[in-house]
């Protein structure tokens, strides 16, 4: 049976996070500042504003995703970027345990979940 990208609602996302999945917010820094981030999330920008893969993404991502079985939870604003990235991580890289927040942080907040303020590191 082929591996597919897991879909998760905010409620399912919380359960997967409790189960030890690594949570990665793949948005850009200005988005983290605007909406905040999900508590416990790693912040690793995946795409530039023009849609290119960010030059630092692979190094930062694979420092967390040590092997194909690493449980990963991705989220972005609406789920579009994470769907594209998650499918690539499964189909091209060979990861086997990747989920994404299907409708992104927009749905997370609409569902009444809170975010933590993001503080730039530099």
Spans of features found by a protein language model:
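Rhodanese-like catalytic fold shared by cysteine-dependent sulfurtransferases
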Residues: 1-21, 29-71, 80-122
């Amino acid at each position: 049976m082929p591996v597919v990208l897991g879909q998760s609602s905010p409620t399912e996302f919380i359960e997967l996070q409790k189960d030890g999945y690594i949570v990665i917010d793949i948005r850009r820094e200005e988005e983290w500042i605007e909406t905040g981030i999900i508590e416990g999330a790693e912040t690793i920008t995946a795409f530039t504003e023009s849609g290119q893969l960010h030059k630092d993404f692979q190094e930062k991502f694979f420092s967390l995703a040590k092997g194909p079985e690493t449980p990963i939870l991705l989220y972005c604003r609406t789920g579009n970027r994470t769907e594209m990235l998650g499918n690539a991580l499964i189909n091209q890289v060979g990861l086997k345990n990747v989920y994404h927040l299907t409708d992104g942080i927009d749905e997370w907040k609409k569902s009444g979940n809170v975010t933590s303020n993001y503080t730039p590191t530099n």
